[in-house]
Protein backbone atom coordinates (compact mmCIF):
# COMPACT_ATOMS: atom_id res chain seq x y z
CA UNK A 1 0.00 0.00 0.00
CA UNK A 2 2.82 2.40 0.94
CA UNK A 3 4.66 1.48 -2.26
CA UNK A 4 1.55 2.21 -4.34
CA UNK A 5 1.13 5.56 -2.60
CA UNK A 6 4.74 6.55 -3.35
CA UNK A 7 4.37 5.54 -7.01
CA UNK A 8 1.15 7.54 -7.30
CA UNK A 9 2.82 10.56 -5.72
CA UNK A 10 5.76 10.38 -8.12
CA UNK A 11 3.43 10.11 -11.10
CA UNK A 12 1.47 13.09 -9.81
CA UNK A 13 4.61 15.19 -9.39
CA UNK A 14 5.81 14.20 -12.87
CA UNK A 15 2.48 15.08 -14.47
CA UNK A 16 2.43 18.37 -12.62
CA UNK A 17 5.91 19.21 -13.87
CA UNK A 18 4.96 18.45 -17.47
CA UNK A 19 1.81 20.56 -17.15
CA UNK A 20 3.74 23.49 -15.71
CA UNK A 21 6.39 23.58 -18.42
CA UNK A 22 6.03 26.33 -21.00
CA UNK A 23 6.57 26.35 -24.74
CA UNK A 24 8.46 29.38 -26.07
CA UNK A 25 9.00 30.62 -29.60
CA UNK A 26 12.30 32.52 -29.72
CA UNK A 27 13.04 35.19 -32.33
CA UNK A 28 16.66 36.28 -32.09
CA UNK A 29 18.85 38.78 -33.94
CA UNK A 30 16.05 39.97 -36.21
CA UNK A 31 15.31 36.53 -37.64
CA UNK A 32 11.82 36.02 -39.06
CA UNK A 33 11.94 32.33 -38.20
CA UNK A 34 11.38 31.25 -34.61
CA UNK A 35 13.13 28.46 -32.78
CA UNK A 36 10.89 26.62 -30.34
CA UNK A 37 11.94 25.75 -26.81
CA UNK A 38 9.81 23.21 -24.96
CA UNK A 39 9.90 22.07 -21.36
CA UNK A 40 10.91 25.45 -19.91
CA UNK A 41 9.61 25.19 -16.35
CA UNK A 42 10.95 28.54 -15.12
CA UNK A 43 12.09 31.77 -16.72
CA UNK A 44 15.78 31.00 -16.14
CA UNK A 45 15.37 27.85 -18.26
CA UNK A 46 14.69 30.24 -21.12
CA UNK A 47 16.92 33.28 -20.61
CA UNK A 48 19.79 31.13 -19.33
CA UNK A 49 20.13 29.36 -22.69
CA UNK A 50 23.78 29.54 -23.87
CA UNK A 51 22.70 30.56 -27.38
CA UNK A 52 21.16 33.74 -25.91
CA UNK A 53 24.25 34.69 -23.90
CA UNK A 54 25.10 37.74 -26.03
CA UNK A 55 21.57 39.15 -26.17
CA UNK A 56 20.77 42.76 -25.28
CA UNK A 57 18.35 42.17 -22.42
CA UNK A 58 17.13 45.76 -21.81
CA UNK A 59 15.22 45.55 -25.09
CA UNK A 60 14.10 41.93 -24.89
CA UNK A 61 10.37 41.23 -24.81
CA UNK A 62 8.51 38.15 -23.65
CA UNK A 63 4.81 37.81 -24.34
CA UNK A 64 2.10 35.37 -23.36
CA UNK A 65 -0.56 34.04 -25.72
CA UNK A 66 -3.70 35.27 -23.92
CA UNK A 67 -2.12 38.63 -23.12
CA UNK A 68 -1.28 39.05 -26.81
CA UNK A 69 -4.91 38.55 -27.76
CA UNK A 70 -5.87 41.22 -25.22
CA UNK A 71 -3.21 43.63 -26.54
CA UNK A 72 -4.50 43.24 -30.08
CA UNK A 73 -8.05 43.98 -28.92
CA UNK A 74 -6.82 47.08 -27.09
CA UNK A 75 -5.00 48.28 -30.20
CA UNK A 76 -8.14 47.83 -32.29
CA UNK A 77 -10.27 49.67 -29.72
CA UNK A 78 -7.76 52.53 -29.74
CA UNK A 79 -7.89 52.75 -33.53
CA UNK A 80 -11.68 52.92 -33.38
CA UNK A 81 -11.60 55.72 -30.81
CA UNK A 82 -9.13 57.71 -32.89
CA UNK A 83 -11.28 57.27 -36.00
CA UNK A 84 -14.28 58.60 -34.07
CA UNK A 85 -12.21 61.49 -32.72
CA UNK A 86 -11.06 62.39 -36.21
CA UNK A 87 -14.58 62.29 -37.60
CA UNK A 88 -15.69 64.91 -35.05
CA UNK A 89 -12.72 67.24 -35.62
CA UNK A 90 -11.85 70.13 -37.90
CA UNK A 91 -9.90 69.47 -41.10
CA UNK A 92 -6.45 70.14 -39.62
CA UNK A 93 -7.16 68.21 -36.43
CA UNK A 94 -8.68 65.34 -38.40
CA UNK A 95 -5.59 65.13 -40.62
CA UNK A 96 -3.34 65.02 -37.55
CA UNK A 97 -5.44 62.32 -35.89
CA UNK A 98 -5.46 60.28 -39.10
CA UNK A 99 -1.66 60.50 -39.33
CA UNK A 100 -1.37 59.31 -35.73
CA UNK A 101 -3.87 56.54 -36.35
CA UNK A 102 -1.90 55.26 -39.34
CA UNK A 103 1.25 55.05 -37.23
CA UNK A 104 -0.55 53.07 -34.53
CA UNK A 105 -2.16 50.80 -37.10
CA UNK A 106 1.29 49.94 -38.46
CA UNK A 107 2.54 48.80 -35.06
CA UNK A 108 2.96 45.10 -34.37
CA UNK A 109 2.02 44.57 -30.74
CA UNK A 110 2.18 41.66 -28.34
CA UNK A 111 1.14 40.81 -24.80
CA UNK A 112 4.34 41.93 -23.13
CA UNK A 113 4.99 40.59 -19.64
CA UNK A 114 6.40 43.12 -17.18
CA UNK A 115 9.46 41.32 -15.88
CA UNK A 116 13.22 41.83 -16.04
CA UNK A 117 14.71 39.28 -18.44
CA UNK A 118 18.38 39.82 -17.59
CA UNK A 119 19.59 36.34 -16.51
CA UNK A 120 21.67 37.81 -13.67
CA UNK A 121 18.55 39.49 -12.25
CA UNK A 122 16.35 36.46 -12.89
CA UNK A 123 18.70 34.27 -10.85
CA UNK A 124 18.85 36.44 -7.74
CA UNK A 125 15.76 38.67 -7.58
CA UNK A 126 12.86 37.74 -5.36
CA UNK A 127 10.09 36.50 -7.65
CA UNK A 128 12.46 37.05 -10.54
CA UNK A 129 12.22 33.46 -11.78
CA UNK A 130 8.52 32.66 -12.14
CA UNK A 131 7.22 29.39 -13.58
CA UNK A 132 6.35 29.34 -17.27
CA UNK A 133 2.92 27.89 -17.97
CA UNK A 134 1.41 28.06 -21.42
CA UNK A 135 2.67 29.50 -24.68
CA UNK A 136 5.11 32.39 -24.88
CA UNK A 137 7.15 34.29 -27.45
CA UNK A 138 10.55 35.88 -26.78
CA UNK A 139 12.24 38.55 -28.90
CA UNK A 140 15.94 39.21 -28.30
CA UNK A 141 18.71 40.77 -30.32
CA UNK A 142 21.77 43.01 -30.34
CA UNK A 143 21.79 46.61 -29.07
CA UNK A 144 19.89 48.95 -31.43
CA UNK A 145 21.46 52.05 -32.94
CA UNK A 146 18.37 54.21 -33.48
CA UNK A 147 15.53 55.97 -31.71
CA UNK A 148 12.02 56.19 -33.18
CA UNK A 149 10.08 59.46 -33.44
CA UNK A 150 6.34 58.91 -33.20
CA UNK A 151 3.11 60.86 -32.91
CA UNK A 152 1.89 64.28 -34.03
CA UNK A 153 5.02 65.27 -35.94
CA UNK A 154 5.81 65.93 -39.58
CA UNK A 155 8.35 63.14 -40.15
CA UNK A 156 7.89 60.16 -37.85
CA UNK A 157 10.38 57.31 -38.11
CA UNK A 158 13.82 56.20 -37.04
CA UNK A 159 16.72 58.52 -36.31
CA UNK A 160 20.33 57.53 -35.55
CA UNK A 161 21.02 57.41 -31.83
CA UNK A 162 23.52 60.03 -30.69
CA UNK A 163 25.05 59.77 -27.19
CA UNK A 164 24.30 62.87 -25.11
CA UNK A 165 21.50 64.08 -27.37
CA UNK A 166 18.27 64.90 -25.53
CA UNK A 167 14.61 64.55 -26.48
CA UNK A 168 14.16 68.20 -27.46
CA UNK A 169 17.14 67.96 -29.80
CA UNK A 170 15.74 64.92 -31.60
CA UNK A 171 12.51 66.88 -32.17
CA UNK A 172 14.13 70.17 -33.16
CA UNK A 173 13.84 69.55 -36.93
CA UNK A 174 10.24 68.39 -36.73
CA UNK A 175 7.09 70.42 -37.40
CA UNK A 176 4.29 69.68 -34.96
CA UNK A 177 0.88 68.75 -36.34
CA UNK A 178 -2.37 70.37 -35.30
CA UNK A 179 -3.27 69.61 -31.68
CA UNK A 180 0.21 68.39 -30.71
CA UNK A 181 1.55 68.90 -27.21
CA UNK A 182 4.21 71.59 -27.57
CA UNK A 183 5.43 71.45 -23.97
CA UNK A 184 6.03 67.76 -23.33
CA UNK A 185 6.99 64.57 -25.12
CA UNK A 186 7.14 61.03 -23.80
CA UNK A 187 10.02 58.58 -23.89
CA UNK A 188 9.15 54.89 -24.10
CA UNK A 189 12.31 53.03 -23.12
CA UNK A 190 13.12 49.58 -24.57
CA UNK A 191 12.37 47.92 -21.22
CA UNK A 192 8.82 49.31 -21.23
CA UNK A 193 9.32 52.23 -18.84
CA UNK A 194 7.87 55.61 -19.81
CA UNK A 195 9.03 59.11 -18.88
CA UNK A 196 7.47 62.52 -19.52
CA UNK A 197 10.06 64.93 -20.91
CA UNK A 198 9.63 68.75 -20.82
CA UNK A 199 10.70 70.09 -24.22
CA UNK A 200 9.43 73.70 -24.46
CA UNK A 201 11.67 76.75 -24.06
CA UNK A 202 10.07 77.56 -20.69
CA UNK A 203 10.33 74.11 -19.10
CA UNK A 204 13.00 72.24 -21.06
CA UNK A 205 14.90 69.59 -19.16
CA UNK A 206 17.73 67.40 -20.44
CA UNK A 207 16.27 63.91 -20.86
CA UNK A 208 18.31 61.45 -22.91
CA UNK A 209 16.60 58.46 -24.53
CA UNK A 210 18.59 55.26 -24.74
CA UNK A 211 19.05 53.36 -28.02
CA UNK A 212 15.84 51.64 -29.04
CA UNK A 213 13.60 54.21 -27.34
CA UNK A 214 10.48 55.78 -28.83
CA UNK A 215 9.91 59.53 -28.51
CA UNK A 216 6.17 60.17 -28.63
CA UNK A 217 4.59 63.59 -29.20
CA UNK A 218 1.01 63.31 -28.06
CA UNK A 219 -2.24 65.23 -27.81
CA UNK A 220 -2.23 68.60 -26.03
CA UNK A 221 -4.55 69.15 -23.09
CA UNK A 222 -5.19 72.72 -24.16
CA UNK A 223 -6.44 71.70 -27.61
CA UNK A 224 -8.36 68.49 -27.10
CA UNK A 225 -11.34 68.63 -24.78
CA UNK A 226 -12.13 64.93 -25.08
CA UNK A 227 -9.92 63.32 -22.43
CA UNK A 228 -6.52 63.62 -24.14
CA UNK A 229 -4.84 62.16 -21.06
CA UNK A 230 -6.77 58.91 -21.47
CA UNK A 231 -5.94 58.69 -25.17
CA UNK A 232 -2.27 59.46 -24.56
CA UNK A 233 -2.15 56.81 -21.82
CA UNK A 234 -3.67 54.19 -24.12
CA UNK A 235 -1.25 55.11 -26.91
CA UNK A 236 1.70 54.83 -24.53
CA UNK A 237 0.43 51.44 -23.36
CA UNK A 238 0.29 50.26 -26.96
CA UNK A 239 3.81 51.56 -27.59
CA UNK A 240 5.17 49.61 -24.61
CA UNK A 241 3.75 46.46 -26.21
CA UNK A 242 5.42 46.99 -29.56
CA UNK A 243 7.38 44.03 -30.88
CA UNK A 244 11.09 44.99 -31.12
CA UNK A 245 12.26 45.65 -34.66
Swiss-Prot record:
Family designation: To E.coli YmcB.
Domain of life: Bacteria
Phylogenetic placement of the source organism: Bacteria, Pseudomonadati, Pseudomonadota, Gammaproteobacteria, Enterobacterales
The species this protein was found in: Escherichia coli (strain K12)
Cited Pfam families: Caps_syn_GfcC_C (PF06251), Caps_syn_GfcC_N (PF20616)
Annotated InterPro entries: Caps_syn_GfcC_N, Caps_synth_GfcC-like_C
Entry keyword set: Signal
Protein name per the record: Uncharacterized protein YjbG
Signal peptide: 1-20
Keyword Signal: yes
Amino acid sequence: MIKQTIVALLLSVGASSVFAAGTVKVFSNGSSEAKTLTGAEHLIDLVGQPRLANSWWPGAVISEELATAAALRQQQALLTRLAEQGADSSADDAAAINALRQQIQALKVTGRQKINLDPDIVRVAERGNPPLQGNYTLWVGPPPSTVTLFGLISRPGKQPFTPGRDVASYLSDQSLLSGADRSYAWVVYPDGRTQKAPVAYWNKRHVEPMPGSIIYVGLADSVWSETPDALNADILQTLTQRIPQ
